[in-house]
Structures are given as C-alpha cells and as structure tokens.
C-alpha cells in the first residue's frame, strides 16, 4: 500500500508500506 504522508519539511512523500 502506498501511503502519502507529509514530511516535516512540508514536502509530500509517498511511503510504501507492506501491510
């Protein structure tokens, strides 16, 4: 599952979570 998260720098980052 690809979960879009907002990093502390404000940039939008897509993290791949294998769940």
UniProtKB/Swiss-Prot annotation:
Highest taxon of source: Bacteria
Q: What class of enzyme is it?
A: isomerase
Q: Name one GO cellular component term.
A: cytoplasm
The enzyme's E.C. designation: 5.3.1.1
Ranges annotated as spanning the membrane: none
UniProtKB keywords: Cytoplasm, Gluconeogenesis, Glycolysis, Isomerase
Q: Offer one example of a GO biological process linked to this entry.
A: gluconeogenesis
How is the subunit organization of this protein annotated in UniProt? Homodimer.
- Record-given protein name: Triosephosphate isomerase
Q: Which organism is it from?
A: Clostridium pasteurianum
Q: Taxonomically, what lineage is the organism?
A: Bacteria, Bacillati, Bacillota, Clostridia, Eubacteriales
């Amino acid at each position: 599952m690809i979960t879009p998260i907002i990093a502390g720098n404000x940039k939008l980052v897509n993290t791949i979570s294998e769940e």
